[in-house]
Regions:
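Basic/aromatic DNA-contact patch characteristic of tyrosine site-specific recombinases
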Residues: 1-119
């Protein structure tokens, strides 16, 4: 009998700094099923990298506040890497995407080989 796949998806996201005009890069995984917990968990791994020059995609709204202010999602290239104006920030985003790729491969392999180890 076939087991349903978990389909854990790993993505790179931004979090606004509270005190400065910069954004923290982090890798988010969802859904992650952990032992002892009934509901799927959202796992965040912060990369200790910040960027200050993301390019915002004005055609993709993230949310609109009660006072009418709209925030936007970052612009991404064809590979899903966040676009930045400065070269240093762009390298940080490429690094974050490499980490995302590694984590995605780990979750995919864990899902594939979980059945073979149990037998």
């Amino acid at each position: 009998m076939k087991k349903a796949l978990v389909n854990t998806r790993v993505s790179v996201k931004l979090r606004k700094s509270e005190y400065r005009d910069e954004w923290y890069l982090y890798v988010e995984s969802y859904p992650v099923f952990q032992s002892g917990k009934d509901t799927p968990q959202r796992v965040r791994e912060y990369l200790n990298r910040t960027i200050t020059t993301p390019i915002w995609d004005k055609s993709r709204n993230a949310r609109t506040n009660a006072d009418g202010k709209t925030t936007y999602k970052p612009k991404r290239d064809l590979n899903g890497i966040i676009q930045c104006k400065s070269q240093l920030d762009q390298e940080s985003c490429i690094y974050a995407d490499k980490v995302r790729s590694l984590r995605q491969k780990e979750y995919d392999n864990a899902a594939l080989y979980a059945d073979t180890d149990a037998e």
